[in-house]
Regions:
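Conserved N-terminal Rossmann-fold NAD(P) cofactor-binding segment
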Residues: 2-31, 40-48
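Rossmann-like NAD(P)(H) cofactor-binding subdomain of soluble oxidoreductases
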Residues: 51-119
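C-terminal substrate-binding/catalytic lobe of Rossmann-fold NAD(P)-dependent dehydrogenases
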Residues: 98-104, 112-186
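Residue-level recognition of the N-termini of beta-strands and the immediately preceding loop/turn
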Residues: 16-20, 78-79, 103-104, 132
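Redox-cofactor binding/interface segments in oxidoreductases and associated redox assembly factors
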Residues: 34-36, 82
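Structural signal for conserved beta-strand scaffold positions within catalytic alpha/beta enzyme cores
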Residues: 22-24, 107, 134-136
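Short, internal active-site loops enriched in acidic
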Residues: 26-28, 85-89, 139-141
């Protein structure tokens, strides 16, 4: 119920009327989307040093096992959106266990990492995020990478900007930006 109240408070930012309440698995039957956002709050392993999103796999799958079947059994035929870490592995697990087609089980993957990358680049350059095109690719975790040859600011490739304006951009430490992006949010 507390989570439902928190979400109900947040709907003031939405442009249309939304009703949120505490429910049961059977309520999923008529839902268009179910967001899977489970985490093991007893340990908080990502809060400890030298841990990764993959360290959450065992406790997360343990929780997922108890919810996917009841949701599917309710008659739910919508879309699963997965944000639980490790999101790529958990998304695949839910896809396999639900029996849903691939296009109905979606993980956020590196979409969030890409927006974080744009924010970090904005902070480092002083240029608005809206003018930055950048994508983090691969697994949402330690193996993600940034294809710098495809990053642009105001339509100009960032590698050209660094080369053409060394006094302004030579301090950009691209490997450090990638590492910062990987560790943000954990």
């Amino acid at each position: 119920k507390a989570q439902a109240l928190d979400l109900a408070d947040a709907v003031s930012y939405l442009p249309h009327k939304v009703h949120i309440e505490k429910g049961t698995f059977s309520d999923c039957k008529d839902s268009d989307i179910v967001v899977i956002s489970v985490a093991d709050s007893s340990e908080g392993p990502l809060r400890r040093q030298n841990t990764t999103r993959l360290d959450l796999l065992r406790p997360t799958i343990g929780m997922i096992k108890s919810i996917v079947k009841p949701i599917v059994d309710s008659g739910f035929d919508g879309i699963f959106v997965v944000i639980s870490n490790p999101v790529d592995v958990v998304t695949n697990y839910i896809w396999e266990k639900s029996g849903f087609p691939k296009n109905k089980v979606i993980g956020t993957g590196t979409a969030l990492d890409s927006t974080r990358l744009r924010r970090i680049l904005s902070e480092e350059t002083g240029i608005a995020q809206q003018s930055i095109q950048a994508y983090s690719m691969g697994e949402h975790g330690d193996s993600q990478m940034v294809p710098w040859s495809h990053v642009s600011i105001g339509g100009k490739p960032i590698l050209d900007m660094i080369k053409d304006n060394p006094s302004t951009y030579s301090n950009l430490d691209l490997p450090s930006i990638v590492e910062k992006n990987k560790k943000t949010g954990i």
